[in-house]
A protein has these predicted regions:
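Non-heme Fe(II)/2-oxoglutarate
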Residues: 1-22
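Short, Φ-rich (hydrophobic/aromatic) sequence segments
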Residues: 3-7, 56-61, 125-126
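Hydrophobic/aromatic-lined pockets within catalytic cores
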Residues: 11, 23-24, 62, 66
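A short coil-to-beta-strand element that immediately follows conserved catalytic motifs
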Residues: 24-34, 69
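Catalytic core of Fe(II)/2-oxoglutarate
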Residues: 36, 48-52, 61-64, 68-128
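Acidic/His metal-coordination segments adjacent to aromatic residues that form catalytic metal sites
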Residues: 39
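Charged, often glycine-rich, active-site loop that binds/positions anionic groups
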Residues: 43-47
């Protein structure tokens, strides 16, 4: 199935070394994988992925997705006035997002604003 293939790809030693070199981090062998289907109104609150996570790889699976559909992964900084967004990534079909994770890598998945489902595969390299 597709999730098993995604896991095998992320577990590939060559890919781990390549992505680790790009990010400047050693990627552990342990993986946590999820398939996401978000519907209108669904979102993830602002959060860092935490101290046990090293890197995240997300694959967009949405054909024809636009900014007006919402559901962007937004990176930024929490402030007293709210979350200040620095950049956004949309889950376009075939687009991948790779980022190093730290206790300061604040991000959110913004609310989905369309009746189309927001689909993605995400994997995290974790130390435990």
């Amino acid at each position: 199935d597709e999730i098993a293939e995604w896991r095998a790809l992320m577990a590939s030693p060559i890919l781990q070394r390549l992505f680790g070199a790009v990010l400047g981090v050693d990627l552990p062998e342990r993986l946590f994988i999820n398939a996401w289907r978000l519907r209108a109104g669904d979102f993830f609150a602002v959060h860092p992925d935490g101290r046990l996570y090293r890197a995240t790889l997300t694959l967009g699976l949405c054909h024809g997705w636009t900014a007006s559909d919402g559901g962007a992964i937004a990176f930024g900084d929490p402030t007293a006035q709210g979350f200040v967004v620095r950049e956004r990534w949309l889950p376009h079909l075939g687009d991948a997002l790779l980022f190093a994770v730290s206790v300061d890598s604040w991000h959110t998945v913004e609310p989905v604003l369309t009746d189309k489902p927001r689909l993605s595969l995400t994997g995290w390299w974790t130390s435990r």
